[in-house]
């Protein structure tokens, strides 16, 4: 990879981080949080709801997939399905990665067989198993940003929930460069 390519990729990643910061602010997400809550909050500002749910995916298949599903036109939603038997940490990563596809505006592939789900309402799915493409790298970058500082939040507990304590938690428990 040439120096120019590295520079271009770094610029693209910086642009992606700025866009993600803006989207998360609009959704009211100011600090690291659980990916299911991120989905819930993003649903408030996204054109359709974003729902993450555990699912019994085949063991030899992907750990997660994203489906845009509309059994009825007014009931359209984006479903992020993740492997039910994966560890909780892996589930968080899978949801963050699939959110990366959603937030990145990645196109859906045609659905061929979703025998476990009523296929008549599905308009497409994201089914990829390789990180070699631009969209996979972009989704992984978004996942990394979403999860990058989440662990810092878990170790800080406060005696109360007033504004000073909240500020103290932000200052001591979370780095400014989280996003």
Locate predicted features.
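Metalloprotease/metallohydrolase-associated module, dominated by Zn2+-dependent proteases
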Residues: 4-42, 109-179
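Short secondary-structure junction/hinge motifs that connect adjacent elements
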Residues: 30-45, 52-62
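Active-site scaffold of zinc-dependent metalloenzymes
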Residues: 48-90, 99-105
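Generic hydrophobic secondary-structure signal
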Residues: 50, 80-82, 95, 99, ...
């Amino acid at each position: 990879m040439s120096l120019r390519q590295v520079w271009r990729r770094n610029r693209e990643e910086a642009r992606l981080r700025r866009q993600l910061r803006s989207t998360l602010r609009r959704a009211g997400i100011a600090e690291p949080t659980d990916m299911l809550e991120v989905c819930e909050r993003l649903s408030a500002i996204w054109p359709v709801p974003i729902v993450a749910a555990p699912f019994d995916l085949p063991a030899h298949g992907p750990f997660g997939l994203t489906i845009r599903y509309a059994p009825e036109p007014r009931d359209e939603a984006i479903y992020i399905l993740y492997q039910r038997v994966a560890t909780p940490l892996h589930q968080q990563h899978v949801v963050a990665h699939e959110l990366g596809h959603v937030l990145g505006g990645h196109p859906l592939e045609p659905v061929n067989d979703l025998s476990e789900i009523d296929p008549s309402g599905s308009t497409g799915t994201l089914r990829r198993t390789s990180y070699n493409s631009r969209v996979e790298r972009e989704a992984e970058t978004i996942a990394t940003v979403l999860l990058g500082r989440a662990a810092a939040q878990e170790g800080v507990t406060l005696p109360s929930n007033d504004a000073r304590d909240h500020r103290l938690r932000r200052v001591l428990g979370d780095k400014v460069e989280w996003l």
